[in-house]
């Protein structure tokens, strides 16, 4: 599952499905506290993606990370936190790099990774991928993260060619109708076992979306009970990505109409 801690990003990538801008808003600490309450109560904390926007542009990025790590450490269970980033904040100065290393080495139960996107096809600024830091523990350079363009946000505005097979929300919506007596925990865990870690996503105000973009319509809220959220996922209707789902065979399309 993903947590958006900010909608701000100064990069301006042409393919951004969030249409993130330099004036994007940030999650408040009060909301983060509620988010972690929800994540722990719902037992969906084993694999968390911290994202944005550009998460390192949140003015309290380090404090947010340490708070999340602290809450998870109390559970005494193995957890993975992945920060998706363009990497420029990390290269900005040695202090930032040391902060990241402390996070990576901070707990035996919590694995922290920085997934650094360096796909030169779409990023307007070129990251220096020769730096030694990228070969150290906890840093993963991803120069081909963008497997396919998704027609949302600036990618849609810029009419970029796309090749997606189904909407981003397809898997969790289909799974909610296939699993017997699904819970939020079973939905998230089943997706994770298949290598799908990005659904659902929690926005900066606590809203829950089923795709991977803040532009997706709200399905539920962290203030709902987990059982209510599952029912809302089952009942969810959205026609925002019909240009993709209309291509699906009927056996699959039935789950997203």
Describe every region a protein language model picked out.
Residues 10, 55, 88-89, 119-121, ...:
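Short, solvent-exposed loop/turn segments at secondary-structure junctions
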Residues 40-43, 107-108, 194-195, 235:
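Flexible, charged surface loops at secondary-structure boundaries
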Residues 34, 132, 240-243:
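Charged/polar, solvent-exposed surface patches and flexible loops
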Residues 58-192, 196:
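Conserved AdoMet/S-adenosylmethionine-binding subsite of the radical SAM
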Residues 162-257:
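Accessory C-terminal segments flanking Radical SAM cores
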Residues 34, 98-99, 228:
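Exposed alpha-helical structural elements
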Residues 1-83, 90-95:
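Conserved alpha-helical substructure of the radical SAM core
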